[in-house]
From Swiss-Prot:
Binds 1 pyruvoyl group covalently per subunit. Its main location: cytoplasm. The gene is panD. This is Aspartate 1-decarboxylase. It comes from Bacillus velezensis (strain DSM 23117 / BGSC 10A6 / LMG 26770 / FZB42) (Bacillus amyloliquefaciens subsp. plantarum). The modification Pyruvic acid (Ser) is found at residue 25. Its cofactor is pyruvate. Belongs to the PanD family. Coiled coil: none annotated. Substrate binds at residues 57, 73-75. It is an enzyme of class 4 (lyase). InterPro entries: Asp_de-COase-like_dom_sf, Asp_decarbox. GO terms for biological process: alanine biosynthetic process; pantothenate biosynthetic process. Pathway: Cofactor biosynthesis; (R)-pantothenate biosynthesis; beta-alanine from L-aspartate: step 1/1.
Length: 127
């Protein structure tokens, strides 16, 4: 049996832009993608901490070191600049792989710089 497991997460990313007239997707700083193992065109889930909205889209790599987190197309209707979002990628794996799998979690500061890297979900609240 295969399970869908969290592979990577950008926790508390700050939306830097919402571009309604761009072809759909999310643009993410390529340094952040590398840190959590996400790839261009990969499907991701986005959770908006400000309004509870959840959506799925795909990744477009953004300029390295820019801190860009830009929701494009229709997704721009579900966020505002400054909103805090969680961006999650998933991976299918066997039960055996899942037992030892360690997702990569990056906790971001207000400028979308990595504040902390976690090997798994913390058992405490991160503000």
């Amino acid at each position: 049996m295969y399970r869908t497991m969290m592979a990577g997460k950008l926790h508390r990313a700050t939306v830097t832009e919402a571009n309604l007239n761009y072809v759909g997707s999310i643009t993410i700083d390529e340094d952040l993608l590398d840190a959590v193992g996400m790839l261009a065109n990969e499907k991701v889930q986005i959770v908006n901490n400000n309004n509870g909205a959840r959506l799925e889209t795909y990744i477009i790599p953004g300029k390295r070191g820019s801190g860009v987190i830009c929701l494009n197309g229709a997704a721009a209707r579900l966020v505002q600049e400054g909103d805090k979002v969680i961006i999650i990628s998933y991976q299918m794996m066997s039960d055996q792989e899942a037992k030892s799998h360690q997702p990569k979690v990056a906790v971001l500061d207000d400028q979308n710089k990595i504040e902390q890297m976690l090997g798994q979900e913390p058992a405490h609240t991160i503000l």
